Amino acid sequence: MKVVAPGAYNDAEAVSTALKLGNAVVLNLAATPDALAKRILDFSFGVASALDANVECVGNKVFALTRIDELTEAERSYLRTQGII
């Protein structure tokens, strides 16, 4: 699982790279300015669509992108302990 908390548009590339490798991605946009967050979401949703990945909102401005059904309970637990969700 890769957690991406983008500070710039170029950081969105980490989403596509991780998904192509089959890793789950948690996209944490909580600290990302709204205009940038929208651009990154548009890009990430496009990547998810192209790769037949699932997108789930797991928290306030936090999204899970997976090429499997959903995050495992262990992954969710880790995100809770990190204060992401």
State where each predicted segment sits.
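Positively charged, small/polar-rich N-terminal and surface patches that mediate targeting and assembly
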Residues: 1-25, 30, 41-85
